[in-house]
Amino acid sequence: MTEFYSDTIGLPKTDPRLWRLRTDELGRESWEYLTPQQAANDPPSTFTQWLLQDPKFPQPHPERNKHSPDFSAFDACHNGASFFKLLQEPDSGIFPCQYKGPMFMTIGYVAVNYIAGIEIPEHERIELIRYIVNTAHPVDGGWGLHSVDKSTVFGTVLNYVILRLLGLPKDHPVCAKARSTLLRLGGAIGSPHWGKIWLSALNLYKWEGVNPAPPETWLLPYSLPMHPGRWWVHTRGVYIPVSYLSLVKFSCPMTPLLEELRNEIYTKPFDKINFSKNRNTVCGVDLYYPHSTTLNIANSLVVFYEKYLRNRFIYSLSKKKVYDLIKTELQNTDSLCIAPVNQAFCALVTLIEEGVDSEAFQRLQYRFKDALFHGPQGMTIMGTNGVQTWDCAFAIQYFFVAGLAERPEFYNTIVSAYKFLCHAQFDTECVPGSYRDKRKGAWGFSTKTQGYTVADCTAEAIKAIIMVKNSPVFSEVHHMISSERLFEGIDVLLNLQNIGSFEYGSFATYEKIKAPLAMETLNPAEVFGNIMVEYPYVECTDSSVLGLTYFHKYFDYRKEEIRTRIRIAIEFIKKSQLPDGSWYGSWGICFTYAGMFALEALHTVGETYENSSTVRKGCDFLVSKQMKDGGWGESMKSSELHSYVDSEKSLVVQTAWALIALLFAEYPNKEVIDRGIDLLKNRQEESGEWKFESVEGVFNHSCAIEYPSYRFLFPIKALGMYSRAYETHTL
């Protein structure tokens, strides 16, 4: 079992044998900690055994592995799939994982419970502390925006506060080291906007030092381009409750612990700080997206308005408006909200409005557990309530692509994942007045309950379902979803394509682009880019093309229109290619990820290395980045700098991405591909597992996040494609 830093310094830990992950047919994930007596009669799933490093995990021992002289790509593919199927939860069909990386999620859970006077259960408290301690920077003891970031004020102050609220004393070596780093960076005064908001709610900062978030903007006509109903869904999801908190200037009652914290996180006494002069103070290490002059002027005008012009009528009207919007968010998502950041802010507002014993607040407490995920390092709040739909859609597709899906040993794996996707389709519309588009028929990123349509997830789910429905092997489950339900999904997907004046032919994430991209000049977050409005994303457009072309091949529904929509999407993909042949990826790292999706999309319309200059440029770029050992490796710095940066060593996931791209493009130099395939085979464990190497995902250019299933899914696909193209060997 791995020894972590928390173990070396003697921090308490729970018994990993007593944890059980519960899932249901809608994909909800929640952890329980049992008594030894309960655990004896409740065996863990193989996923739980693997994740928590239980020696009783049924480790596979395939006959042929990398030490066998005749070990083929298909052998490696089959071994990887045989291992991966053990990570599927039998009750739900999902492939659970700890979708972690961001270091600013857990503060909401801990702060809301502290403010509400709710004691976090001891087993959770212990593991929340362990996770934060185990993700501290190994040199200076601070924390960053994400788990592989340098130490920042934002990450360090929030996680320091969490540790103190959870009971770690200020003189504990972990706290002392982190506090030293925080003060060296200038103290909490340099925290970005979201940090200042949480500190103000905890009475550790003053609201006059927080840039405003006026709820009155929701009273403006929707026809105005700046109306917040036109913003990106995550941004408006956060700033609806934040605008309420900003309006009422909520700070929790002072306690002795908070008094201590006030004295620990600043470089000078709290009472001597002029907070109003520090609205724009952000530590240079934190600052990814500086304020525009436009935003600074707007903030100054709003501060003047709030101080001298806001009247009680407007105050009450705007307060009611945003709380009504919070209630629609809770209704549309059964209190999950779009993600944990806005869920925690919504919970705090609900606590203020309705009280700790209210049904609404208690439901939010229940739903907090959906994103609270345990792992070997400890427990953390994930980036969302999971990646259930995304991973299931890929698993089905890639098992088919690899020639595995119809083999008897994978029948249950495919059926279970397919059943989950059938259950995960949205079958209701949002509450009127939610500023939400039609969603019935679509799929989201995680679960049906979460309820937010995502374009590429809808497309990939449709493609996966059609693959199963086309196979006679799975005839017993074909009835679970009708063609008419797929048509509803296609209707939503087509409605998400940008065919107006914004980025013609592209697909964004959750909605069409509804406001000019120039709105980004009002980005207040300081640590993220591209958050104000929807943006066109090449990989979302690629996935949408994959779903539409596959559907178009087998159905006549809206056939001519779909043909046109595919054509204009392909035009956008080509237009998005950079002069060096690359595409910038926004949801995976980075140029390698986007290149894979782009070249697969172009393959679906018949474009290959031989007949397409776009494909040739894309392949030549990827080949130029191959490392000496035959693999590929790209750093998170690529996402931040918008320029390709090699990682320290080649990586399995990115090698698979590059190989998939080259195989779809029919790249003619087989030796290049062979070297990459050899790396995937050699990095595989004898059991079929690939070990974690580096973070795979990213969002908003600056925040890394892990996709643990990627190290199985994409190598399986790459090896399977290679085997079908070049090998006659069968298992």
UniProtKB/Swiss-Prot annotation:
Optimum temperature is 35 degrees Celsius. SUPFAM superfamilies: Terpenoid cyclases/Protein prenyltransferases. The active site is at D456. It is found in: Lipid droplet; Endoplasmic reticulum membrane. One of its GO terms (molecular function) is lanosterol synthase activity. GO terms for biological process: ergosterol biosynthetic process; triterpenoid biosynthetic process. CDD domains: SQCY_1. Keywords: Acetylation, Endoplasmic reticulum, Isomerase, Lipid biosynthesis, Lipid droplet, Lipid metabolism, Membrane, Repeat, Steroid biosynthesis, Steroid metabolism, Sterol biosynthesis, Sterol metabolism. The keyword Flavoprotein does not apply. GO terms for cellular component: endoplasmic reticulum membrane; lipid droplet. PFTB repeats lie at residues 125-167, 615-661. Pathway: Terpene metabolism; lanosterol biosynthesis; lanosterol from farnesyl diphosphate: step 3/3. It holds the Pfam family SQHop_cyclase_N. Catalytic activity requires the presence of ERG27. It comes from the Eukaryota. Lanosterol synthase; part of the third module of ergosterol biosynthesis pathway that includes the late steps of the pathway. ERG7 catalyzes the cyclization of (S)-2,3 oxidosqualene to lanosterol, a reaction that forms the sterol core. The third module or late pathway involves the ergosterol synthesis itself through consecutive reactions that mainly occur in the endoplasmic reticulum (ER) membrane. Firstly, the squalene synthase ERG9 catalyzes the condensation of 2 farnesyl pyrophosphate moieties to form squalene, which is the precursor of all steroids. Present with 2193 molecules/cell in log phase SD medium. Belongs to the terpene cyclase/mutase family. This is Lanosterol synthase ERG7. The lineage of its organism: Eukaryota, Fungi, Dikarya, Ascomycota, Saccharomycotina.
